[in-house]
């Protein structure tokens, strides 16, 4: 089950209370204080793990709490620290304050560890309160309460290439033939109900991650169809590949315009992101000469439109996933784009 959003209360452990204790030894009827300190409460720690792909482990849980620190004991024995609670989450998980929507943590790298809530400090035992005017203090500190916070965990998939298109245009078929992903494929809309990641091996030394995002429909940015629930996953993709279907009644140019408008409404940054265009189901041109001519006119109209607008488009290619034509060229084109983006990012961090 793919779960990409959960609301949960997280709480670090309370500090253990300090002990009130006195030495009890033979021949020492009024021994001094020997109460140990309470242990600190356990911390809440987030750990990013790329072997985890969903937030399903948090589903149905209202609260997760780290262990409380143990109380202090006599003979100056300190209480044990409460065990930390480590929360394993996928790459791309954001921890958001459920009330203010402030992003508190952004976990994007394998092995990333972030202390989120510190456990409460253990109370001091009565040993600390002995002084000249009070040799037998009968007071010890209570432990300090741990922290608590209501948060929303949001998963935004991280991929090099995000597939953008209407439902049933061939995105799932494409990712199934170029990568190790095995999405459900059927001839009806919204076959893909959850995002899928696939590793695309271009050659022995180069690969990239592709994300199959559930189909977008007009009005998706306002919540129609699968709407906002999955548009957010496109935010973490470096490069967009628009998949356009020549078999749809809507012309290719109109498909592209509608898809781009939905991205623009959702995020201005997405609208300006670099992209390529793939015309899917190119084998369909075999259905007749007249249909082939119509598709050619469609593609020409789209090409002219792209030249008219100021856009970051890098290529336009025809592909048949069924006949496996154009796939090799597509993979190399995408790899070159990803390499360029990676190098640019690397230069920015130097």
UniProtKB/Swiss-Prot annotation:
GO terms for molecular function: GTP binding; GTPase activity; magnesium ion binding. Pfam families: GTP1_OBG, MMR_HSR1. Mg(2+) binds at residues 172, 192. GO terms for cellular component: cytoplasm. Keywords: Cytoplasm, GTP-binding, Hydrolase, Magnesium, Metal-binding, Nucleotide-binding. Its cofactor is Mg(2+). Residues 1-158 form the Obg domain. Its main location: cytoplasm. One of its GO terms (biological process) is ribosome biogenesis. Its EC number is 3.6.5.-. It is found in: Cytoplasm. Residues 159-339 form the OBG-type G domain. It is an enzyme of class 3 (hydrolase). Gene3D superfamilies: GTP1/OBG domain (2.70.210.12), P-loop containing nucleotide triphosphate hydrolases (3.40.50.300). GTP binds at residues 165-172, 190-194, 212-215, 280-283, 320-322. Belongs to the TRAFAC class OBG-HflX-like GTPase superfamily. OBG GTPase family. An essential GTPase which binds GTP, GDP and possibly (p)ppGpp with moderate affinity, with high nucleotide exchange rates and a fairly low GTP hydrolysis rate. Plays a role in control of the cell cycle, stress response, ribosome biogenesis and in those bacteria that undergo differentiation, in morphogenesis control. HAMAP family: GTPase_Obg. Monomer. This is GTPase Obg. It comes from Campylobacter jejuni subsp. jejuni serotype O:2 (strain ATCC 700819 / NCTC 11168). The gene is obg.
């Amino acid at each position: 089950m793919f779960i990409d959003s959960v609301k949960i209360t997280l709480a670090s452990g309370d500090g253990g209370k300090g002990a009130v204790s006195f030495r009890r030894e033979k021949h020492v009827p009024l021994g001094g204080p020997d109460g140990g300190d309470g242990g600190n409460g356990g911390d809440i720690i987030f750990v990013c793990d790329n072997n985890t792909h969903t937030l399903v482990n948090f589903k149905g849980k209202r609260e997760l709490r780290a262990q409380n620190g143990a109380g202090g004991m006599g003979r100056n024995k300190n209480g044990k620290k409460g065990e930390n609670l480590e929360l394993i989450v996928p790459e791309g998980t954001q921890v958001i304050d459920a009330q203010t929507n402030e992003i508190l943590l952004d976990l994007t790298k394998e092995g990333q560890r972030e202390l989120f809530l510190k456990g409460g400090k253990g109370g001091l035992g009565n040993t600390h309160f002995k002084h000249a005017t009070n040799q037998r203090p009968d007071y010890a500190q209570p432990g300090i309460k741990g922290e608590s916070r209501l948060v929303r965990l949001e998963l935004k998939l991280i991929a090099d290439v995000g597939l953008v298109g209407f439902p049933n245009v061939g995105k799932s078929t494409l990712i199934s033939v170029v990568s190790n992903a095995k999405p459900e494929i059927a001839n009806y809309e919204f076959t893909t109900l959850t995002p899928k990641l696939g590793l695309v091996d271009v050659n022995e030394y180069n690969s990239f991650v592709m994300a199959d995002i559930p189909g977008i429909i007009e009005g998706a940015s306002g919540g129609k169809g699968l709407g906002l629930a999955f548009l957010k996953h496109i935010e973490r993709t470096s490069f967009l590949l628009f998949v356009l279907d020549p078999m749809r009644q809507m012309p290719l140019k109109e498909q592209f315009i509608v898809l781009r408008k939905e991205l623009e409404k959702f995020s201005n940054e997405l609208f300006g992101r670099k992209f390529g265009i793939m015309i899917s189901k190119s084998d369909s041109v075999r259905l007749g000469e007249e249909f082939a001519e119509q598709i050619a006119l469609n593609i020409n109209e789209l090409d002219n439109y792209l030249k008219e607008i100021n856009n970051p488009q890098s290529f336009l290619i025809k592909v048949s996933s069924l006949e496996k034509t154009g796939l090799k060229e597509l993979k190399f084109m995408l790899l070159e784009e990803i390499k360029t983006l990676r190098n640019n990012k690397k230069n920015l961090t130097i």
